[in-house]
Every structure is written in structure tokens, then in C-alpha cells.
Amino acid sequence: MNLQENSSQQLKRTMKSRHLFMISLGGVIGTGLFLSTGYTLHQAGPGGTILAYVIGGLMMYLVMQCLGELSVAMPVTGSFQKYATTFIGPSTGFMVGIMYWINWVVTVGSEFTASGILMQRWFPDSSVWMWSAIFAALLFICNAFSVKLFAETEFWFSSVKIVTIILFIILGGAAMFGLISLNGTADAPMLSNFTDHGGLFPNGFLAVFIAMISVSFAFSGTELIGVTAGESANPQKDIPRSIRNVAWRTVIFFIGAVFILSGLISWKDAGVIESPFVAVFAEIGIPYAADIMNFVILTALLSVANSGLYASTRMMWSLANENMISSRFKKVTSKGIPLNALMISMAVSCLSLVSSIVAPGTVYVVMVAIAGFAGVVVWMSIALSQLLFRKRFLKKGGDVKDLTFRTPLYPLMPIAALLLCSASCIGLAFDPNQRIALFCGVPCIILCYLIYHFKRNVTKAKKISQEEYPADHIL
């Protein structure tokens, strides 16, 4: 492919509203919902689990409202990395971009490994490595061929997950209240699992607090819609609509599914169930429930990997476009694909995959810890960028009425987002299982700042040019 670097050869604006919506949902709905919810339910109880998801959803909603104002005013690829560069400082923009890139390349490698393991259910004698390589090659082709192919692939991947969740909520709710009979059960559970076995908070509020920390990270991925802003065909119209839809639908899907799970499965049994979704579908009497959910979870894994590969590639392109890393990574093909950035992102994802086998207790643990911590750091940067953007916008004589998308209740909403995200970070220190994210993430942030300041005399980061977005008078 012919790679070009001239200013006129930028990324292509070909994504439609439905693509933006599904890509954002695809990044957030993964195995955490389908597999890990049982563990959270066992840990925090039914009331604690729902409360944890409500607070996590609230945090996500606050951040998305901040991102909406920024993305509509400045619809550029790289999104929050460029916003952090312009409104917080170039060193913070560099840190945010690197942390977000690490987050996704590690995640993509993990998804490939998990996908290979799932395939062994149907092909027990096959190799995990073989399936991982096949899926990696397929997703690389989807991302390398054209933005439209990637977007369409992600649209259908995400559709499978969303249909499954909707069916689960409808059928599970019907079974919970006696409209559908459960196998081997005379009476519908109704709300008994919320009142029996210790009630809503059987393990106390400390368990709820710890669950809140882990669940708050489960919503990371919705910010992907900001990364797509620079390739949206009509950002002024599509981004506001997509952000509003993603925010409330994600909350409904997550909390609705968790409510049904909590009503149908006792919190005492939830910790030993491999997949609570399989258990519920099997109890309802859905034939081949395990195989169906194996396919859905496989689709979820590939969807997250697909979105993650896209996000890491665009973030690397954005860093190169800001003169923060080698200019080789901002070269694009004639179809607007940053192929060099795609290849290096895929290569590092594969190294992450290898480290999960070769050094699972050392290198891989550290990488996963940093990746998990990166999500909340990015959210904090979005909230702070919006706070500073609005302040500068008003100082330069801007009128809030001129903003197509306005963050409500400014400055309370971005401040609340910052406080909740900060609480999540601090809370990591109180959970022995998640403390490593804090211990590895903070040094990585410091290292990013040191690297940037070491290199700043060699390359200078550029602010978003006035041609790239309509709010040019705030600079």
C-alpha cells in the first residue's frame, strides 16, 4: 500500500451515526458483564452489586457529557489526547495518549488469548495459538482494508451482544416474575433473592465499596466515541446523538441485566457459576444455552479486540500527528488507514499475548495492571479538559449558546466526574486484589512525564489547528 504523509491526506470521514453508537458500545460490553458479574454478585450481594453498577454508570454518564461538549466543538481523531494537550498541557497529552494506547494493546492481546480458549469448546484438540493467530489476522485485515469495513464489522459484532442482553432481560424478567417457568422450580423467585440469605447487603458495605471500585472500571470503553470523532461523516449531528444514546442505553443494559441476575441467582451460588448468563438461559430452558453463550462471548471478545485495535491505532496516529512520537506513524494509505500505527499496535498486542503465556506472573501482570489503571486516568483527563475548555471559551468571549452540545450543570458535572474518578483511584489502595494497578500505574504515569520532558527539546507538540474545529477563537 502507498503510504502518504502530506497534509491533505488525512483520515477519512466515512463513519455514520450507527457506527459511532455501536463502536462505543462494542468497547464497553465485553466479558466483564457476561462472566465477571457473578463474582461481583457473590462479593457484594444483590443490593451492593446494583448500587455498584449505578455509581459506575453515573460516573460514565458524567464523563460522557464532558466528552460530548469537547468532541462536538473539536471533532478530531485522537480526541481526549488532543484536548489534554491543548487545555491541560502537552506533557499530560503525551501521558494520556501513551496510557490509553497501552490500555488497548494489552486488552487486544488478552482478547485473542481468551478467544482461542473459547474455541476449544468446539475443537478440543486444536491449539489456542492457532485460533489466536486466525482472529488476529482477520481483525488486522478488517482494520487495514478500510474504515468502512471496520465500522461495519464492529456494527454486527456489537449487534449480537446487544440482542443477547435484550433477550436476557426480557426472558429473565419473565421467568423472575412467573411468566415463564424455570426448570425444576415450582415457584418464580420474584424478589426473594433480594430479601433472603442476608438481604441486599449480606457482606456489609466494605464489600460494596470494593465492588464499586472494580465495577467503575467496567464502563471504560464508552469514551471510544471520542476517538471516532475525526472520522465521523457528520460530527456536529452524529456525535451528540450517539453520546446521548450510548450513555443511557449502556446504563440500562448493565443495570437491567444485573437486576435480573440478582433476582434469579442467589448471591451465595453466583461465585461458583462459570457464566451466570449460561445458568439463567439453561434454567429458562433455552436449548444449547452453553454453546449459544460461548458464541456470544466469543463475539464480545472479538468486538472488544476490534474496537481496541482501532483505538490504539488512532491514538498512535494522533501522537505522531502531534509530533510526540515518530512521524512514521502518521502516514496513511490512500484509504486513510494509518498502516504503520496499525502494524506496531498489532505487533505489541501479540507480544502481550505471548507474555500472558511465557511470563503470566511478572510482565503480563504489570501490563494488565497499567492497562486497567489507564482507563480512569483518561476519564479524569476528559473531565479536566472540559472544565478548562469551557473556562477558556468564556474568557475568550465565547457564548455558551454557540456550543452545539453543552455539558449540563457546569462546572458541577466535570467536578463530580473528577471526584468520583479520584475516589476510584484512591479506593484501589484498599483492595488487595486491585492494589497492583495503583502501584504499577502511578510509576508509569511518572515515567511518561519524564520521557516527554526529556524529548521536548527535540520535538514540539502542536496545538489543534484552527482549521480542524469550529471553536477556533478559544485558542
From Swiss-Prot:
Cell membrane keyword on record: yes
Transmembrane feature ranges: 20-40, 44-64, 87-107, 127-147, 162-182, 199-219, 246-266, 277-297, 341-361, 363-383, 410-430, 434-454
Gene that this sequence comes from: hutM
A single cellular component GO annotation: membrane
Single biological process term from Gene Ontology: amino acid transmembrane transport
Gene Ontology terms for molecular function: amino acid transmembrane transporter activity
Keywords of this entry: Amino-acid transport, Cell membrane, Membrane, Transmembrane, Transmembrane helix, Transport
Name of protein: Putative histidine permease
Subcellular localization, as worded in the UniProt entry: Cell membrane
Assigned protein family: Belongs to the amino acid-polyamine-organocation (APC) superfamily.
Oxidoreductase found in the keyword field: no
Membrane topology classification: Multi-pass membrane protein
UniProt cross-references to PANTHER family, sorted A to Z: GABA PERMEASE, GAMMA-AMINOBUTYRIC ACID PERMEASE
Primary location: membrane
InterPro entries in UniProt: AA-permease/SLC12A_dom, Amino_acid_permease_CS
